[in-house]
Amino acid sequence: MLPTLTALLCLGLCLSQRINTEKETLPKPIIWAKPSIMVTNGNSVNIWCQGAQSASEYQLYFEGSFFALERPKPSRSMNKVRFFISQMTSHTAGIYTCFYQSGELWSKSSNPLKLVVTGLYDTPNLWVYPRPEVTLGENVTFFCQLKTATSKFFLLKERGSNHIQNKYGNIQAEFPMGPVTRAHRGTYRCFGSYNDYAWSFPSEPVTLLITGGVENSSLAPTDPTSSLDYWEFDLSTNESGLQKDSAFWDHTTQNLIRIGLACIILITLVWLLTEDWLSKRKDHEEANRLTNWECRRRWRMQHYFEEEQRNAISMMELKATPGAL
């Protein structure tokens, strides 16, 4: 019993230490870019990193390597810092992450921030077939063409989704859509690029107009790649959309783990105590049974000896009486 309780206590201490160790990693910060993550070549951009109020240092990493360090200045917004990139080029376009330090602890990495530089190549041409104004349910195709051969084209809907559609191509790419709904209407631009983060100048805008009667909710795109939900490159830049309090979920998870661990240990202890009580009760009943048997055995032995003694006395009395025999 004692070794089992000792083992359970050690298990609880080890798991508690494991939870405390995991807790010693601070929640991940929030990262975003202003004015946008799409920056014209040569223009400046600000990268913001926001962590805990007690953060003393922030580090910015570019493509997995250390890039810059900033310390928060005494102000009302001590929980965030600004990293300034004076001139955006193809060498500064890519994936950024940030960390912060509070005391002796470091946070987890932020979500990746993808910075895109534009204006590096020729300006592509964009047009839509069969025409810019179509009726509900028609199929349309956007064509993006660049004089200089490239490897990938991107189609972006302005002030619409935070994602863009991409296609591989040499000097031209096609972006089929349809059957179109009112969600497809809007202004589009396209870009050419040699990688995901270095793009050409934007094309001239092309506005897609959707006309017709009441929209049929059963209309669905025939090409799986033409759906407005089909995107491969995330361009989320909204600061408020990135503000997610992961600390709440971290603490909730840790508390649930602790409660679960406590319940497991409590149930195990109750089971062990019940087993111990049943074992002792069984031993006690066995001892009582043996005691009763021993008492009966002794009583029979005593009765036997007393009977033998009476018989011996009777025989002696008979022998002592003259003429008894």
Curated annotation (Swiss-Prot):
> Which parts of the chain does the record assign to the membrane side Extracellular?
17-255
Q: Where is the Ig-like domain?
A: 34-118, 129-211
Tell me which domain of life the UniProt entry assigns to the organism this sequence originates from: Eukaryota
For whether the record's keyword set contains Oxidoreductase, the answer is no
Keywords from UniProt, A to Z, are: Cell membrane, Disulfide bond, Glycoprotein, Immunoglobulin domain, Membrane, Receptor, Repeat, Signal, Transmembrane, Transmembrane helix
Name one matching Pfam family.
Ig_2
GO cellular-component term (any): plasma membrane
**Subcellular localization, as worded in the UniProt entry:** Cell membrane
Record-annotated disulphide pairs: 49-98, 144-190
- Name the GO terms of the biological process aspect: defense response to virus; detection of virus
The UniProt entry lists membrane topology as: Single-pass type I membrane protein
Q: List the InterPro entries.
A: Ig-like_dom_sf, Ig-like_fold, Ig-like_Receptors_ImmuneReg, Ig_sub, Immunoglobulin_dom
Cytoplasmic topological intervals: 274-325
Q: Write down the SUPFAM superfamilies for this protein, in alphabetical order.
A: Immunoglobulin (SSF48726)
Membrane-traversing stretches? 256-273
What does UniProt give as the signal peptide span?
1-16
In this protein, the residues bearing a glycan are: 139, 216, 238
Per its database record, what is this protein's job? Cytotoxicity-activating receptor that may contribute to the increased efficiency of activated natural killer (NK) cells to mediate tumor cell lysis.
Quaternary structure annotation from Swiss-Prot or TrEMBL: Interacts with CD3Z and FCER1G.
Its family remark reads:
Belongs to the natural cytotoxicity receptor (NCR) family.
- Cross-referenced PANTHER family: MHC CLASS I NK CELL RECEPTOR (PTHR11738), NATURAL CYTOTOXICITY TRIGGERING RECEPTOR 1 (PTHR11738:SF14)
Protein name from the UniProt record: Natural cytotoxicity triggering receptor 1
- From what organism does this protein derive? Mus musculus (Mouse)
- Species classification: Eukaryota, Metazoa, Chordata, Craniata, Vertebrata
